Amino acid sequence: MAKKNSSYMDDQSWSDVRDGMRIDWDVPIKMDDGVVLRCDVYRPIKNGKYGVIMTLGPYGKFLHFNEIYEDQFVRMSEDFPEVPSETTNKYQNWEVVDPEKWVPDDYVCVRVDSRGAGRSPGVIDIWSGREAQDLAICVDWAGVQSWSNGKVGLNGISYYAENQWQCAALQPKHLAAICPWEGAADYYRDMAHHGGIFCNGFTKVWSEAQVYSVQHGRGTNGFRSSMNGDWVSGPITLTEEELGANRNNFYEDCLANKLDTDEFWTSRMPDWSKVKVPMLSSANWGGQGLHPRGNFEGFVRSVSKNKWLEVHGIEHWTHFYTNYGMDLQKRFFAYFLKGEKNGWNKQPKVQLQVRHPGEKFVERHEKEWPLK
């Protein structure tokens, strides 16, 4: 473990130079209420000013993709050998970018553990207004660091897409572009109450299996990271009673708040009239039980003058990592974060992968959505 070597690090932070990157682990970001979140910063070894790709969420920034979703990673790698190629895969993390494929292109990748999750203390309150504020603060923190060019982009799947809508509506100064990849926006309709009927299974199973399992304070009772050998949900270890006191029970909250007009839901809805940032909204035809409505609604209802819609098929996570998805993301962010004249402004506003029999997808370009 290397010692800290940056002014923004503290006694819990450390830095490594390996695999062509400088990695600053457990860097503190202080929130306006005093809570200190922890992030990992993957950046080029050479000092410079770079565009920033950021995510904030509850799945544990130290937790390797393979440590909890091995079957998904193996299947994706077998179907698309390009995904595990040209990278050691040491830093693969569920539903966020692989820094080994972004840092060489002169980006800084910042992963933040959300309040109460992973390495960040506090109380978990899933998709709350407080969490959206935290993300906005993190964006503006990243925008003024010595390695930043002042332009921050948000990019990630599912949870890491959903809170992009909320953050964009808060309009942090340094937010330059977003790419919500398969991300719901209306948690009442898209997740908890389909057609007004409570969805008992998902909210309970998902929150317990994917969020509370890596809650901050599980410490030595949780996962040990293969990335750096430290505890995913450390450094402290709390009792089950203490852990319970440090989270709002998402399932019980969903059950108790039965109407979409309840403050619990309205406080989690983005104000579309304030979502003005350039966006690439990427949906999946096959995820109708959760995410795609958010991507379509976000594209249609936001007031951004620079917005694109892309729709694809197959699994929920796969195309985010394939050459197809990476090409879209990198061209989009290069244009808006780095100022590259790469022709993105001529990209069709709507790009659809239309499904045909035999698992065949045919690309189709359109000028608007809904189609006319």
Q: What would you call each of these model-derived segments?
A:
Residues G60, S114-G118, A184-A185:
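Alpha/beta-hydrolase active-site loop signature
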Residues S146-Y159:
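Alpha/beta-hydrolase fold nucleophile elbow
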Residues D33-R43, V52:
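A short loop-to-beta-strand scaffold at the N-terminal edge of the catalytic core in hydrolase folds
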Residues A2-W25, K30-V35, K173, N249-E263, ...:
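Alpha/beta-hydrolase-fold serine-hydrolase catalytic core, especially in secreted/extracellular enzymes
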Residues K49-P58:
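Short beta-strand element of the alpha/beta-hydrolase
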